[in-house]
Amino acid sequence: MAAGGNGAGGDTRAAFARIYKTLKEELLTDPAFEFTEESRQWIDRMVDYNVLGGKCNRGLSVVDSYKLLKGADALGEEETFLACTLGWCIEWLQAFFLVLDDIMDDSHTRRGQPCWFRVPQVGLIAANDGIILRNHISRILRRHFKGKPYYADLLDLFNEVEFKTASGQLLDLITTHEGEKDLTKYNITVHGRIVQYKTAYYSFYLPVACALLLSGENLDNYGDVENILVEMGTYFQVQDDYLDCYGDPEFIGKIGTDIEDYKCSWLVVQALERADESQKRILFENYGKKDPACVAKVKNLYKELDLEAVFQEYENESYKKLIADIEAQPSIAVQKVLKSFLHKIYKRQK
């Protein structure tokens, strides 16, 4: 989850960074595998390259949310460690998804550097590295949470979110399948389903669900909160689709390729809804082609249809609805958690 504004304080960030080193060292000395020096160095470099480098907003959100739920300005040492550890599990999950997503999307850059599979000597070893990253999560959870009453709920939560995210990725991939390009399949319902499952659950619901479990809560009692966070995640992904086309690549850390990749983007769905027959013909002839001239024609059509203004209206209406839904929640602490998420992403530029 990209965010600006008021994130975690310096003390929280320092603790978060310190705990990363502890978790990584545990993984590098895991007695379940006899590492050679070469394999240990590979894992060390691979984890740093892929888990670090982002803004860590998903992970830090666990700590911030836990504090708000407890009504505490500061957490005890063990509470901080456990919250940060769950936060890092989400960052590891994000790394796992991104390593594999970049291979499937044939991407070039991620977080301002080459995608891991494009690093010399890595290539498709990155696919196995992704599997290792996912397995690290299970090992971290077992080491630090096995004795907790909510351990089984944590495992279920991560497994459920991973399944939903992978299913969303599948829907995204088969909808944009090479050789079967058919823009008539693209509509707001298909787009909504993809982003709900591909992004919203792991980016928005998972951090808050982790904080709720740490607080001793039963997730079955928070269906409304799940729905609000999924809506927020949808809004976030629409922002992402918008920034893919209109954001500054140097500022957002990646070069947008949704048009070239034939993505079921919010922008193309909006264009299809608004275009006349001649404009639709331009989309059908140019969308999903690598040729810069074709990309330019699509972007020019977006400008003709004034999709920037359409997005601004969508953003404002989404914000109003989310605020109303949040303020309908009976728990003030839960309201604070949800508002903290919303304020981090509202009007973001990266």
UniProtKB/Swiss-Prot annotation:
Primary role: Catalyzes the sequential condensation of isopentenyl pyrophosphate with the allylic pyrophosphates, dimethylallyl pyrophosphate, and then with the resultant geranylpyrophosphate to the ultimate product farnesyl pyrophosphate.
Positions of Mg(2+) 1 binding: D101, D105
Pfam families the record matches: polyprenyl_synt
Database matches in CDD domains: Trans_IPPS_HT
Keywords in alphabetical order: Cholesterol biosynthesis, Cholesterol metabolism, Cytoplasm, Isoprene biosynthesis, Lipid biosynthesis, Lipid metabolism, Magnesium, Metal-binding, Steroid biosynthesis, Steroid metabolism, Sterol biosynthesis, Sterol metabolism, Transferase
Residues annotated as binding Mg(2+) 2: D101, D105
Cofactor(s) the protein needs: Mg(2+)
InterPro entries given in the database record: FPS1-like (IPR039702), Isoprenoid_synthase_dom_sf (IPR008949), Polyprenyl_synt (IPR000092), Polyprenyl_synt_CS (IPR033749)
Cofactor note: Binds 2 Mg(2+) ions per subunit.
Known pathway: Isoprenoid biosynthesis; farnesyl diphosphate biosynthesis; farnesyl diphosphate from geranyl diphosphate and isopentenyl diphosphate: step 1/1; Isoprenoid biosynthesis; geranyl diphosphate biosynthesis; geranyl diphosphate from dimethylallyl diphosphate and isopentenyl diphosphate: step 1/1
The name this protein goes by in its record: Farnesyl pyrophosphate synthase
SUPFAM superfamilies attached to this UniProt entry: Terpenoid synthases
Binding site for dimethylallyl diphosphate: R110, K198, T199, Q237, K254, K263
